[in-house]
Amino acid sequence: MDKLNKKNKNKRIRGLQISIASAEEMRSWSHGEVKKPETINYKSLKPETDGLFDEAIFGPVKDFECACGKYKKIKHRGRTCEKCGVEITESIVRRERMGHIDLAVPVAHIWMTKELPSPSKISLVLDVSYKEVEEVVYFVNYIILNPGNSKNPVFKFKEVVDLSGKGSKSARIKLRKVLREIKDKHQADKHSIIYKRASDYYNKLKESHLPFSIDEVAKFIETHTGIRLGIGAEAILELLEGVDLQKEYDLINEELNSYSKDLKANKEDQKVKRALRRLETIKWLKESGIKASNMILKVIPVTPPDTRPIIQLDGARFTTSDINNFYRRIIIRNERLKKIIELRAPSVILNNEKRMLQEVVDALFDNASRKKPITAKDKRPLKSLTDRLKGKQGLFRQNLLGKRVDYSGRSVIVIGPELKMYEVGIPAPMILKLFKPFIIRELIMRFNEDGQEIKPIAPNIKIAEQMIAQKSERIWDIVDKVIKERPVLLNRAPTLHRLGIQAFEPKIVDGKAIRLHPLVTTAFNADFDGDQMAVHVPISKEAVAEARAIMLASWHILGPKDGKPVATPTQDMVLGNYYLTTEKRNEKGEGLIFSDFDQVILAYEAKQVSIHALIGLSTKCLTKKPFAKQGIVITTVGKAIMNSIMPEEMAYLNDGDNLLELDESNIVFAGEDFKQKLAKRPLYKPFGKKTLSKIIEILYKNFPLQKVPQVLDKIKEFGFKYSTLSSTTISVFDIPRYDNKQEYITKANEMIAKLKHMYQKGLLTDDERYTKVIRLWADVKDNVSRDIKEIITRPEYKENSIVVIADSGARGNISNFTQLFGMRGLMSKSYNYDQKIKSQVIRDTIEVPIKHSFIEGLTINEYFNSSYGARKGMTDIAMKTSKSGYMTRKLVDAAQEVIINDSDCNTNKGIVVSTITNSLDGGVVETLSERIVTRYTIDPIYDEKTKELLVDADTLITSELAEKIAKANVTKALIRSPIYCQSTKGLCQKCFGNDLTTNDLVQIGTAIGVIAAQSIGEPGTQLTMRTFHTGGTANEGNITQGFERLKQIFDVVSPKEWELATIAENEGVVESITSDATARIIRIKTRLEAEEYRVPFDAVISVNPKDVVYPGSKLTEGSIDIKHLLRVAGIETVRQYFLEEVQKVYRLQGIEIADKYVEVTIRQLTNKLQVIDVGDSDYFVGQTVDINKFRKEVTNMLIANKRPPVAINQVFGLDEAPAKTGSFLSAASFQDTKKILTDAAVKNQIDYLVGLKENVILGNLIPAGTGFMSSEEIIKAGEEALEKEY
């Protein structure tokens, strides 16, 4: 077995190369030529000889059996039947053996001639426009192959001429000119045949509409002047064979050097663009050693027959793959063309037949991109080879990256409150189906683990299967044994982040539904209203060990996006623990003192003391708790019960606001009056959802990992138990009364009447009136909301069920209360964001609010508006889910190759971080301490006042150090960042810092790119689709926020005209802000001269006179155009802007994401350069290169005393970034499959399989996580994890 493992390890594919095959290579792959269009015989259903399914070419249909039946056993393996020519081997070879078709004439490859999505490669090599190449290939126009031997030639080399007479007349005029030259030459002998024929052709060409034999004229002209015309792929082939790549390369370089000084300015110039593209293609061909003529096909490979099968349907009908249809047409047309050539048919017929062959070969390769695709009987375009590769249903995404999995099932989920955190209840029928092979193995086993012979329960597999089908009594012990051996994986779609798949130990349950532990629902985003989940069984030892050691649900306490607990109690569980820890005065048994915990329980169960009663508990029974002095703790029965489940060493939990230590006012020491101290002690708030979350964080930080799920399970049990005992109910009569609303509404109505009057008088624009009305009603709702908050915090409502449910964090919030007995408020309406309007105000809110609350009831009109808003909410969610999913996909594709694979890259560059504030209202978006925690410093951090050293250089900032820095009021710090990591592949540990899910240094092999993409993409669905109105004045303008803004940033899209911010282009001081008739003018004095910026009247200016501005500083509010910012201020400013803007979008919606994940993405979007001066390097002008590779190249060139290249930074959006990775497999499986594979083939590119996707495609283990470990290490980790389960 070890030998086998070693053998398989060496089998790992190290790289994959793609190239353009020559005719010789294609013939070498082939096992024979396919000459007939037939597939299988309609009577015998056997493949026809020389046909598309021929056994002699592709291999036998049945294992080790030839076509005629002479050889029928494995013993004949390797022989070839003398009678039918079939090799005796396995039938699986029909999936790999190829055939070929020899074409009668050369044919162009459609990927090389078509312009979209990439420029036509043939057109670039020949320097002929793509339109003209197409005209020649499809036999519309002729191309000049030789301009003749005249001193001043009439035709140019490679000129495309239209001789049909339908279009331009110039070609006929030129031909007449040539003919006149021939006539003039033979003027002396007017009776010669040459002169007569020249005159005859000349006269025919005089009349533009008259047809003439182009072939005859062309041959005549060639004989006498050397001018040669060509048409079709043959002509293109001849030209390609004559191309001298080195010469072309030098010529283009010369051309570029003439205007490379202004290249930056010229980048959009069409001439420069085309020259750069040509240079690129010719350099690729030159370096790859591929002949340019390979772009024209002389042979077509025939794919293996089992990849394009014929399938018999019921009845005598057959269905076949579309590919066979294309091959059939190709063979028929090819054979017909051969015959026509033999018959020496006229050129018109010949050219038409050649064109038809060209078209059908095009259809085979790429049917969809033709103007008129070949269709089936039902008018459906047939699926060509390209269609089989691209898109969601293509080979890459359907068959290689997303396969259907065996040993899996799905069912509806229901709650399983009795389960432990690592358990899942699987229905018995499902267990029997999923674990069937394992159960059968145990049933028929003849030897036990020690090798002793035992009597099998079932004599053979058939009987074992019957026992399982009949659910025999004897199988259940075996089933119990089998399911203990392996956990199962549970997955809920959509899998937005890694917690969407977790492992559990299975338990058999009755019924047909899967039972899920209530604490993992948050991670799966599951609820029990009919959600379904899929179950998968890991098969190999390594998979089982990995599931146990890494994926078990009880290890996933913290969420990856922000390091906050994700396995927190919700709803009933919160309510139960809130009830349990509530304190009340004058309850039964108040003031009793107990010596130990058992006494408390005994008294409670004997109903001698209430669960909320304040009691005393001796600290002597709490031996391991960190008390300074012994005494009696003042607590409640409920809190004593709560503390009984916590680790013994943990501080006694009494006050939710101070969980780390117990305040001395809670302890009665010897000699103090217990009753007096009890009366003085304030009542503490019960433990709500936030407190429970804090407790879990403390547990996770200070105690072994396996302790946390144990406590969580107990919290869950108490939650359900005590929420039941609390018998909390709600009714209409629990809702408090509220009567102040009317006065607010009356005042608002008066104000609206005034605004309307002002609008009619022309003192306000309609936009201003609308904005003020919306603001007014929003203020009314805020006032109502404030009143309601005050009402529900009154002492008389302390025990009100609805208030308790909201206060504990179990369900509901202040906004629900406002709608319930305050007012419903403003509703949103649909709005087309993309319409290009000049109006500054986006009217996506109905300006008449809903003035009633739900308890009062709505009017018909209000009900309509309300339901309209609710329905819009539902459709928005559906829209958002798909858009957010697509964005996650793009993020993953951009960052999937970023893996931690180095301990330290020793960089001295980092980012300077400070608190992020919102420029409009100055509110804090993200504090400095939040930004630096779990990161490494580059420089030491000092207290800015006392100059005391707070943190040394190259030190990890823990949460304690971050707090220390925050207290010292430090304003900025220089820290390590993924953006500046100098590892050539992936990232190093120190640039990333701590893993948020473990609070330890991130491990080598962590696929941090994917985790970053998931952390940014997963909350995407929670972002709103609407445009927010920020600020308070009417002239504030709108800033796109929420999801649309995120898309705008990541796709690097220029903002719309009305939201574009004006930025300073140079450093200077604001001199003045003035206005003229058309705009406001901001005047800035720079070192050299004064600059003026004209901004619209309604723009919000964000600078004041005497302010210092820098390149890229905002002069007006709005969104900055990132490409413009790059030109003005450079890449560092762009990266900083990117980071701050993404964080603003999320934090304004209350979603926390760690900076470092955003930085990983920014790194991927900004780590490419464009070469503008090649120096002595091998680069070419305009080439895109990776920043770290470029840095290495420059260093090497400086060491070698050569002139280094010069490059400028580039920023790519998420649509372009994945295509710029070094892997063509990864890029092709993302988008633009055709373009990427064409480019890669011309380059002769090698994919070294650095990222994850390309390894998955080829069936390798991914180079991350346990992909770095040996099988033995993985299995050992699994065994250790099994011991830790409680």
Curated annotation (Swiss-Prot):
GO cellular component, one term: DNA-directed RNA polymerase complex
UniProt keyword annotations, A-Z: DNA-directed RNA polymerase, Magnesium, Metal-binding, Nucleotidyltransferase, Transcription, Transferase, Zinc
Binding site for Mg(2+): D527, D529, D531
Listed name of the protein: DNA-directed RNA polymerase subunit beta'
Residues in coiled coil: none
Protein family (similarity comment): Belongs to the RNA polymerase beta' chain family.
InterPro entries referenced in this protein's UniProt entry, alphabetically: DNA-dir_RpoC_beta_prime, DNA-dir_RpoC_beta_prime_bact, RNA_pol_asu, RNA_pol_N, RNA_pol_Rpb1_1, RNA_pol_Rpb1_3, RNA_pol_Rpb1_3_sf, RNA_pol_Rpb1_4
List of residues binding Zn(2+) 2: C905, C981, C988, C991
GO molecular function: DNA binding; DNA-directed RNA polymerase activity; magnesium ion binding; zinc ion binding
EC number of the protein: 2.7.7.6
The protein's required cofactors: Mg(2+); Zn(2+)
UniProt cofactor note: Binds 1 Mg(2+) ion per subunit.
Role of this protein: DNA-dependent RNA polymerase catalyzes the transcription of DNA into RNA using the four ribonucleoside triphosphates as substrates.
Enzyme class: transferase
Pfam short name (any one): RNA_pol_Rpb1_4
GO aspect biological process, one term: DNA-templated transcription
Cross-referenced SMART domains: RPOLA_N
Binding site for Zn(2+) 1: C66, C68, C81, C84
HAMAP family reported for this sequence: RNApol_bact_RpoC
Catalytic activity: RNA(n) + a ribonucleoside 5'-triphosphate = RNA(n+1) + diphosphate
Subunit structure, interactors included: The RNAP catalytic core consists of 2 alpha, 1 beta, 1 beta' and 1 omega subunit. When a sigma factor is associated with the core the holoenzyme is formed, which can initiate transcription.
